[in-house]
């Protein structure tokens, strides 16, 4: 029946049990800033979101290569206070390739991070990363007038800080990612 079909295609929602159990990653090509010519090289937004807490990490990098993905991973590992066990992405070439020579895959292996991938041509299975990119586009990029690429990077840092410490998230009982992490690591404080 029609109802059975809809229920089968409905998303299976889940939340991981602890911080770092799985981080969802994705990449998006950013639009040009007002005043830039169409020949200007595009920049790319890299995001990582912790499944348990919804803590967001983001960076703007010059290209969508395995080396930029590796650089972003190293930035996340430097900033992240908990161990990341799995990194879940689509099958983009920035994340997947020959494991013996691919910079991002080598960095994951060195950090003992298991890579997990979406089924081919099903980006919706990486919904948390897809959704956070949509949020970034709608609440940060479309609402801010950037006067330079450096200004855009600065505003991204501010937005990520707001997202992690002020914005409540329905998927984690209207807590902020910071509150979710504090509840996990310091339950006696609440």
Feature map (PLM): residue ranges:
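Mobile-element integrase/transposase regions
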Residues: 1-49, 55, 71
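Residues immediately flanking
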Residues: 27, 51, 63, 91
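RNase H-like two-metal-ion nuclease catalytic core shared by retroviral integrases
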Residues: 89-91, 95-108, 115-138, 153-158, ...
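Active-site beta-loop-alpha junctions of metal-dependent nucleic acid enzymes
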Residues: 41-42, 58-82
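Short small-residue beta-strand/loop micro-motif enriched in glycine and branched aliphatics
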Residues: 55-59, 116-118, 142
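Residue-level detector of anion-binding/catalytic polar loops
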Residues: 83, 114
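C-terminal domain-tail junction helix/linker
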Residues: 5-12, 21, 111-113, 135-190
